Amino acid sequence: MKHTFKAIIITVMCTVFSTNGIAQIDHWEKLVGENDTWQYRVGNSEPSSSWMNTSFNSSSWSSGTGGIGYGDGDDSTVITNCASLYMRRSFTVSNLNAIEALILHADYDDGFVAYLNGTEIARANVDTLTPPYNYDPPTWREAKMYQGGEAVTFVVNKAIWQGLLTNGTNILAVHTINHSGANSSDMSARYWLHCGVTTATQIHAAPAAWFDFDCFESPVAILRINTFEETIPDDPSIRGIMEIVWNDTATNHATYDVASDLITNIEIEKRGRWSQFVYPKNGYAIETKDFHWEDTDVSPLNMPMEEDWT
């Protein structure tokens, strides 16, 4: 049986209006930029298991300006062909209490896992918990920005980052992984970390020139769907992440708020010929998936458990 979502706003990753129980973001700032100087290690062997932690000593690693990679002409630091790449960037937070949201942007080829102070905050095209240096991502993926596209937006779960981010020095660490290993003809590793600030005073660097996040609040649930900057086709379905922002005790919900109701992998495609060719707003068929991309039942907004949704 298929169920239909009701009263959910679908957002596309700005201006904030209205506040009602949610700290209002005044503006956005950049904590980490792709063209910062990163420490990096070419992944042709396994690193220390603590490489992403704040206590790890990376003084023996190479350093270079991001993005880092080879083969696409979008790399400030060019490296040799490799199976994967490990990167670390330290940054300073000056007023933690003023930060309301974190957004990670990633332009990558082919998969990645990102860590904040040693804890995972985002991943794409990786379906194993801790990928080894020679892990092979499930699918091939090309970077977008050098082709005129956009970086992928990841809203970092506040329930996670709030317990990680500290005043003073922090570490963003990213493992970027090639499909087909060192035989791959290219690799792209470009990452940014932005924060939404509630005060009018600028504390950190200005956001990237292209930064744009659709900020608003809603009295009904907000549905975030991330297809990693891939266009949703008629067929076949593509992979993505679906999140629902909803709290029974809140009167308003923000697009950058905690996805406390649901976070799940999905496969999504356009649904119905009328949706594609007649109506300006498309209908979609969604199948929910577990960590390993197997079918899984979910119960969004206390609806009956199901894996197929429209």
Q: Predicted regions span which residues?
A:
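Bacterial N-terminal signal peptides that target proteins for export
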Residues: M1-I9, C14
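Aromatic-lined ligand-binding clefts that engage carbohydrates, nucleic acids, or primary amines
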Residues: W38, W61, F91, N97-G118, ...
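Surface-exposed, low-complexity/disordered Ser/Thr/Gly/Pro/Asn-rich loops and linkers
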Residues: T54-S90
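Extracellular and analogous surface-interaction loops
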Residues: R88-A98, A159-G163
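An acidic-aromatic loop/edge-strand motif
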Residues: D127, T139-F211
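Phosphate-handling architecture centered on phosphoinositide signaling
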Residues: M187-T310
